[in-house]
Curated annotation (Swiss-Prot):
This is C-C motif chemokine 14. Has weak activities on human monocytes and acts via receptors that also recognize MIP-1 alpha. It induces intracellular Ca(2+) changes and enzyme release, but no chemotaxis, at concentrations of 100-1,000 nM, and is inactive on T-lymphocytes, neutrophils, and eosinophil leukocytes. Enhances the proliferation of CD34 myeloid progenitor cells. The processed form HCC-1(9-74) is a chemotactic factor that attracts monocytes, eosinophils, and T-cells and is a ligand for CCR1, CCR3 and CCR5. PROSITE patterns: SMALL_CYTOKINES_CC. It comes from Homo sapiens. Disulfide bonds join 35-59, 36-75. Belongs to the intercrine beta (chemokine CC) family. Residues 1-19 form the signal peptide. Keywords: Cytokine, Disulfide bond, Glycoprotein, Secreted, Signal.
Length: 93
C-alpha cells in the first residue's frame, strides 16, 4: 500500500489531536480547553449570539464564552461593558 508523502503529516496531526482530546477527557469534569486564555478584540453583533456560559473558576483568567448561531465559541472579557450588557439582556429574555 502506497501512502502519499503529503498524507503522512495529516495522519500524524489527526493522531496527535485525538490523543490530546482523550488525555484531557480522562482527567475528570474540568478541562483546560474550557478556559479562556485570550479574549476577542472585537464586539460580536448581538443578533449573532445564541447562548453563553462562564468559564470554570479553576481557569487562570475569568471568561464569558458566547456561542454564536453558527456554533462558534468566542471568549470574551467579563469586565467589558458590552459583555455585561449582552448577559443582562440574555437573562431578561
Amino acid at each position: 500500500m502506497k501512502i502519499s508523502v503529503a498524507a503522512i503529516p495529516f495522519f500524524l496531526l489527526i493522531t496527535i489531536a485525538l490523543g490530546t482530546k482523550t488525555e484531557s477527557s480522562s482527567r475528570g469534569p474540568y478541562h483546560p480547553s474550557e478556559c479562556c486564555f485570550t479574549y476577542t478584540t472585537y464586539k460580536i453583533p448581538r443578533q449573532r449570539i445564541m447562548d453563553y456560559y462562564e468559564t470554570n473558576s479553576q481557569c487562570s483568567k475569568p471568561g464569558i464564552v458566547f456561542i454564536t448561531k453558527r456554533g462558534h465559541s468566542v471568549c470574551t472579557n467579563p469586565s467589558d461593558k458590552w459583555v455585561q450588557d449582552y448577559i443582562k439582556d440574555m437573562k431578561e429574555n
